[in-house]
Amino acid sequence: MHWIWLVLLLAVVGAIVGAATNALAIRMLFRPHRAYSIGKWQLPFTPGLLPRRQKELAVQLGNIVANHLLTAEGLGKKFGSTAFAAELTNWLKKQLASWLRSERTVESILKPLFQADIGREHLVVQSKSWLKDRLKRYLQKNKEVPIKSVVPQELQDRLTDWLPEASALLLKRATAYIDSEEGEQRIGAMVRQFLTTKGKVGSMVSMFFSADKLTEYVLPEIKKFLHDEQTKETVQSLLQTEWHRMLNRPLASFQAENYVDQFVDKAAEELEGKIPVLNWYNAPLSTWTTPYAEPLVERGVPVIVGMVTVYMEQHIADILSKLRLEEVIEEQVASFSMAHLEKLIMNITRRELHMITLLGGLIGGIVGLIQAVIVHFFY
């Protein structure tokens, strides 16, 4: 009977010692978090293993993740897999379809992103201000530049080719005016003014011809002059001369900067209600995206996903090298408090560490039994 109690006692003591030893060893992996000293003598095993080697642990974890887990080859295969592309496509389709059906306006979406007033009126004012400033800067910078350097060559050629037509149109309009009642009255008034302002010469002419009679003689001659081919050539030559002279004038000679504000304000007034983007700006997305929703979702998303996955597959190595994952992980792990790092490791390995403690107790119990047998038979 005494022998049985001895066996049980030694087995229990061995189990307790074995379990306690393993539990203490596990505890010493994490604790203490800092070094303790008596005077100048630092106590051994302080700090614990992981606190002492936290920096080295961070470096090794970074290398393991970057070189063996998140590798370019592995991620490239993932991006290149059909299953991943299909999953990403379906997810993006759902997200885009939901977004296009949204009752939110473009303004409400953009405002939080830019953290500024981007209402329609504000955008119009800012656009006008920006355009005025740009035009004035351009005119100031190029004030000595001839017009021909500013006007596109194609437009210059078209206007030059149009000059014969313009001269013909000018003469045609002049002829039509002369043939009109207003034109005849105007010519008659000019004749009367001539007679009254030329003193003796006018009085002498008036003795032979009345103003109306003289007008009847002058009108056919004017019409004949307007229909003459030489007149057409002269007008065309004058227009071409003035056109080329204008092309060589400096931009500043037109004083265009004085009309910039008026021009921009008028253009903005005319265009504001005709630009679809501005009309869509304060309208819910669903009211104007409906015609485009199906093509975007069904055809646009697969194309975009295909382009993105191919690009990522081809350039993932460069992207990872720029990210420097090992440095990111190293810095992150090194910045953890030891308590947080201990919690992370314990959450992952708690069951296994508990089994190690129990294994220590089991081995200690077996050693205790062996000791009991040795004591009983040899002592």
UniProtKB/Swiss-Prot annotation:
Record bears the keyword Transmembrane helix: yes
Chief site of localization: membrane
Similarity-based family: Belongs to the UPF0754 family.
GO cellular component terms given for this protein: plasma membrane
Membrane disposition: Multi-pass membrane protein
Protein name as catalogued: UPF0754 membrane protein ABC1518
Pfam families: DUF445 (PF04286)
Subcellular location: Cell membrane
Organism, scientific name: Shouchella clausii (strain KSM-K16)
Keywords: Cell membrane, Membrane, Transmembrane, Transmembrane helix
Transmembrane segments: 1-21, 358-378
Family matches, as PANTHER family: UPF0754 MEMBRANE PROTEIN YHEB (PTHR35791:SF1)
